[in-house]
UniProtKB/Swiss-Prot annotation:
Annotated GO MF terms: dGTPase activity
Protein name per its UniProtKB record: Deoxyguanosinetriphosphate triphosphohydrolase-like protein
Organism, as annotated: Mycobacterium sp. (strain KMS)
HD domain location: 72-217
Top-level taxon in the UniProt lineage: Bacteria
């Protein structure tokens, strides 16, 4: 039997690509490792620099907007918490799903999806840019932790099951816009996916993906309400609900407009939603809003657990034993909330103007770094640029450096190296 299809995590799942030497700083008599392999994986992600940098990377609005900003880091913490709770209910290893939540956006560049778009434009002729593929590249190559026998970086050297848990799209680019591996990372990808069903994410990755959808939909709407951009009472307006349903049907072709209209109606009639009313920042309004976010997260997470259990039965569910099942009505409700954020935050005219400026800044920084490389590159990246065999590989190094930047650093590099206008 293929070891990846067995009913428990085994040595195959816990294997690391590179053998690691015993720790040398251990006090005599204290050398026993009390953590599981997956707990160690989680700790490696939690302590890595790439995760910390997410504190200055945009979720929906900028990390320096407002007094209680959500950043890519806080979003990742929320995804990890939601996913961990779901893992307990399903029988997945909680540390695996937790670390997948922590790492699921670790490859995001400055300005979130907008920065991703800009870097994809720059790298279009050389394999493109995709945040999920960058996740894998960071974890298996770019984040310094372990060296292989040739002295090359093996990234964090996570276990096979951990890397698979972070992989939402287990395929190369091809003609698809969403993908999980760049061409020059395929040796690591083949190792991770050895024996796995073709193009099927493991259950832990599916749980992480749904936890991401739940956190994204609920918490981004919460931020929109607090900022005054979203008024939840629009859900009860027929015209507004119809508009959200049209948007949702375009974004999620598997959902019918009638399902989305019904979802908007259900949401509007939920007491925890209607009680938020016109948010005014008072104690009562803040408590009502927090109650809504808490109950919706629980509703969406528990629905997936219950539906999956109804299909797969009891016992521990993990890896490729089953797939995550989510009721259509719940998928529709999450889609409606996503469309609220899209329509009232991300499609705002002022927001679109800011995004255009951000993309221009990334393009200009790429030109600056490319024109002055390798001296313009950090010590981690400059040797890779020098060793690269062609322009595509050299450009990938420049892309790696830009993707690693916080928004603050990107703006400092742009300001310092851009020509200043004459007074």
């Amino acid at each position: 039997m293929n070891p990846r299809l067995q009913d428990s995590y085994d040595e195959f799942d816990r294997q690391r690509r590179v053998d690691e030497p015993a720790k040398s700083a251990v006090l005599p008599g204290t050398g026993t490792e009390h953590r599981t392999d997956f707990a160690r994986d989680r700790a490696r992600v939690l302590h890595c620099a790439a995760l910390r940098r997410l504190a200055d990377k945009t979720q929906v609005v900028g990390p320096r907007e407002g007094d209680t900003p959500r950043t890519r880091l806080t979003h990742s913490l929320e995804v990890a918490q939601i996913g961990r709770g779901m893992a307990v209910g399903l029988g997945c290893d909680p540390d695996l799903v937790d670390l997948a939540g922590l790492a699921h956006d670790i490859g995001h560049p400055p300005y979130g999806h907008n920065g991703e778009r800009a870097l994809n434009e720059i790298a279009k002729a050389f394999g493109g840019f995709e945040g999920n593929a960058q996740n894998f590249r960071i974890l298996t190559r770019l984040e310094p932790k372990v060296l292989d026998a040739t002295g090359r970086s093996a990234g964090l050297n996570l276990t096979r099951a951990a890397l698979d848990a972070v992989t939402k799209y287990p395929w190369q680019r091809g003609d698809r816009t969403k993908f999980g591996f760049y061409g020059d990372d395929m040796a690591a990808a083949w190792w991770v996916r050895d024996g796995a069903p073709a193009e099927r994410p493991c259950l832990e990755a599916q749980v992480m993906d749904w936890a991401d959808d739940v956190a994204y939909s609920v918490h981004d709407v919460e931020d929109g309400v607090v900022s005054g951009r979203i008024d939840l009472r629009v859900l009860a307006d027929d015209d507004a609900a119809a508009s959200l349903a049209r948007l949702g049907a375009e974004a999620f072709p598997t959902l019918a407009p009638d399902d989305l209209l019904a979802a908007a109606e259900r949401l509007s009639q939920m007491p925890v939603v209607s009680q938020v009313g016109k948010y005014d920042g008072t104690l009562g309004a803040s408590v009502a809003l927090k109650r809504m976010t808490s109950e919706l997260v629980g509703r969406f997470a528990n629905a997936a657990i219950t539906e999956t259990r109804s299909v797969a039965g009891g016992g521990a569910l993990h890896r490729f034993v089953t797939e995550l099942a989510v009721p259509t009505l719940v998928r529709a409700e999450v889609a409606v909330l996503k469309m609220l954020a899209l329509q009232f935050i991300m499609s705002d005219h002022g927001h679109l103007g800011i995004q255009a400026d951000q993309r221009t800044r990334i393009h200009e920084v790429a030109l600056i770094l490319w024109g002055q490389a390798p001296s313009s590159l950090d010590p981690l990246f400059a040797p890779e640029f020098v060793a690269a065999e062609d322009d595509g590989a050299r450009l990938r190094v420049v892309i790696d450096q830009i993707a690693s930047y916080t928004e603050g650093r990107l703006e400092r590099v742009h300001e310092a190296r851009s020509p200043r206008p004459l007074d």
